[in-house]
Amino acid sequence: KTVAGFCIFFLVLFLAQEGVVKTEAKLCNHLADTYRGPCFTNASCDDHCKNKEHFVSGTCMKMACWCAHNC
């Protein structure tokens, strides 16, 4: 009796997890307003975008720092 209850419980739990769909927000790029100089390392650009301009992330593209934000 308890084994059947556990089986039903885990079946419901498993089916509930299947219904959860993860969605990723689209990111849009924006040229960093206050980053100065050529961008050589993604780490420094990412740190600048997150901490100084409050964006999601940052990356170097064509020696310029681009910050990403949710569209």
Curated annotation (Swiss-Prot):
Position of the signal peptide: 1-25
Disulfide pattern: C28-C71, C39-C60, C45-C65
Record has Repeat as a keyword: no
Post-translational modification: Not glycosylated.
Function: Probably has antifungal activity.
Subunit structure: May form dimers.
Stated name of the protein: Defensin 1
Organism, as annotated: Arachis hypogaea
